[in-house]
Design a protein with these regions (language model features):
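Glycine-rich beta-alpha junction loops
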Residues: 52-54, 78-81, 102, 158-159
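Catalytic-core segments of class I nucleotidyltransferases/pyrophosphorylases
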Residues: 62, 66, 94-184
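Conserved catalytic core of nucleotide-sugar-dependent glycosyltransferases
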Residues: 84-86, 90-96
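A short acidic, often aromatic-flanked loop/helix-cap motif at beta-alpha or helix-coil junctions
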Residues: 25-29, 81-82, 104-105, 160-162
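Conserved N-terminal catalytic core of the sugar/cofactor nucleotidyltransferase
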Residues: 1-49, 53, 58-60, 67, ...
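Structural beta-sheet core signal
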Residues: 47-48, 72-75, 153
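Short, conserved catalytic or adaptor-binding loops enriched in Gly and charged residues
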Residues: 9-15, 89-90, 144-146
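Conserved donor-nucleotide/metal-binding helix-loop-beta segment in metal-dependent transferases, i.e.
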Residues: 56-84
Length: 184
């Protein structure tokens, strides 16, 4: 219910529409994305993780991806604690690899849980093997696009936090109270 109230049909964020699905149990983000194949209708899609809270909207990134002929796009944000996130290793203007929660991060750029994919993402997911956690990992999907040099990226403007820990949930509440969220 709250997702529907907050996000509506997606038009306010520059999207054509938003569809919702429900994942029973834990299977990984890529498994959850696989559930969306039936309503993606061969079109490009945007995936936003439910614990992301951002200051600015993603309209600019949506427009950049809309003009991209094929492949994927992720949003990055420089963070003080990159070991908590998937981290992008940058080589010039491209991403060389994404490493999930590295002990020694190769950059301070966390992968924000906002992803854009072309219709090939579902074929990529079908080739994945479950990780050691028994899940289909979105990092593996992103690394496949990187290997094919079909991944682009933008820096997310404004602040970003996840609400995945009690500490980050408190921080999210403070940030939203101070500046609001999803501002134009």
């Amino acid at each position: 219910g709250d997702f529907l109230k907050l996000l509506g049909n997606g038009k306010e964020f520059g999207l054509k529409h938003i569809n919702y699905t429900y994942q029973e149990g834990e299977g990984g983000i890529a498994e959850a994305l696989r559930l969306a194949e039936f309503f993606a209708s061969g079109e490009k899609i945007c995936v936003v993780l439910g614990d992301n809270i951002i200051e600015k909207n993603i309209r600019k990134a949506v427009e950049h991806f809309r003009r991209q002929k094929k492949g994927a796009k992720i949003l990055l944000k420089e963070v003080p604690d990159p070991q908590r996130f998937g981290v992008a290793e940058l080589k010039g203007d491209r991403i060389a690899r994404i490493e999930e929660k590295p002990g020694k991060p190769k950059s301070r750029y966390a992968v924000v849980g906002i992803y854009f994919f072309d219709q090939e993402v579902f074929n990529v997911i079908k080739t994945l093997k479950p990780s050691g956690r028994g899940e289909l990992e979105i990092t593996d999907v992103n690394n496949r696009y990187i290997e094919k040099r079909l991944m682009t990226w933008d820096i997310l403007e404004g602040w970003w936090t996840d609400a995945g820990t009690f500490k980050s949930l408190i921080r999210a509440n403070q940030l939203v109270a101070k500046t609001g969220a999803n501002n134009l």
